[in-house]
Amino acid sequence: NINDYKADINNKNLKYTIDIHNIKKYFYWGTSVLITQIIILWFTQPKIIIICLLYFFISILYNYYLKQKKYFDIFTISVFHLIRIYYGSIAFDVDLSLFFIVFCGSIFLMIGANKRLVEIYKKYENRPYNFDDKRKIEILQIIFGLIAILIFLLYSLNEKKNIYFENGNIIYLNLVIIILMVINFLNSQKNNHQDIIEFVFKNKINSVLGILFFVIFLSNSIFL
């Protein structure tokens, strides 16, 4: 977002530069890429055009309005990720369950809330939050984490899921791992205040738990 460039230089110690005097050039270039993409999709994947246009519209709305609105910005970030997942499900012809959508949405909301909490601690410029909002966001991220755990628990208790696994009870082991990952994330971020990308690459406990989750989940799946 060109509008946040100056603030991001200070917030994130960016090493690259952008000629902000050529905003029109960036706009025309981005518009050209979008139109080209729409034309290609019109002939190859017409169903995805609506998704791309929706994503583009929300992006504009977020960058120029919602990003400066408390809590709406967190929700919008989650929507971005859900749209990408839906896009991928169409591209690979995969059906998404309600459990999966709500679970992912809750995780994205937890991460989004934590991202804003980190920005408060680091005193980022051009953000709608201040230190007085810290406690509210801390509670929000915990609530979203608990909702994600609850959704995975409900999925584990759902007997319909058994047709997708060799052993329906092993899924409870995945539930335990999810609980540990959420606890590890919240506890680690409480002490370190890392950007989510930095957390993913540096937190070894989370990496081990994540790998263990997928190994158990996929090895128990009837599709492999």
Task: Please give the residue ranges for each predicted region.
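Intramembrane alpha-helical segments
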Residues: 25-92
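Membrane-embedded alpha-helical segments that form the functional core of polytopic membrane enzymes
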Residues: 1-3, 46-62, 104-106, 169, ...
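Hydrophobic, aromatic-rich alpha-helical transmembrane segments
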Residues: 23, 45, 49, 70-71, ...
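C-terminal membrane-associated helical module and adjoining short loops/tails
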Residues: 34, 64, 82-224
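Aspartate-rich (DDxxD/NDxxD/DxxxD) Mg2+/diphosphate-binding motifs
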Residues: 1-34, 67
